[in-house]
Amino acid sequence: HRQGVERLAMVVASSIGADLAMAFLTQTKLPVEHAFFDGGQFAQIGKGTRRMMTPFLYLAIKSLYWSKGGTLKKILWCDDDSIKPYFIDAGENLTYTNLRRHILDSLEDKPFPSLPEELQRHIYFEFGSTEDHFKYRQAVMKAYPCGNYPVFEGYNHMQYQIRDPKGFAEMLAHIAERDCMPELPFIRK
């Protein structure tokens, strides 16, 4: 408000970054017209498992830097040259302490925060049909029964936005302008 912002047309979050967006949605006083969550951000993993996975995830991300992106296909579903620089930079800048804190503060095995039904009607929780975290979709649907749950058929975690950033941006603009998903051939509703 102090900077003249009266409302937000859309909040967009991907993967485990969605924890921050969900916290924002539950705490902000600004009206939010739409939200779009892409991927398996709602995985609920016990604290002990998150602690055990941290060193392995750290080494996996660091290996992307050490190998100049050569290990990307072994870690993720793709090795697109267009996204390698982002993962290489992430691997270079990652510290174990920051990753440990982030993992312990996200993916928590606890109830989802409540959201007003009216806001739920304007939230899109997208999952790719081939991503590992597709199994969490039912839990999200139970927590937010008024939400929208498109499935990107044949897509993996965050694959559409990585492979077609322009198409992804156009889809978000369509949602913000028309309050519905565009007709895309790979969307299962």
Language-model segments: what does each one mean?
Residues 1-9:
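Conserved acidic catalytic loop of the alpha/beta-hydrolase fold
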Residues 12-21:
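Gly/Ala-rich beta-loop-alpha elbow adjacent to hydrolase catalytic centers
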Residues 155-167:
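Catalytic histidine-centered segment of alpha/beta-hydrolase-like enzymes
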Residues 47-48, 64-117:
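Conserved alpha/beta-hydrolase catalytic His-Asp/Glu region
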Residues 22-62:
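Flexible "cap/lid" loop of the alpha/beta hydrolase fold
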Residues 144-158:
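Catalytic histidine neighborhood in serine/cysteine hydrolases
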Residues 180-189:
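Alpha/beta-hydrolase-fold serine-hydrolase catalytic core, especially in secreted/extracellular enzymes
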Residues 104-142:
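Conserved serine/cysteine hydrolase catalytic core
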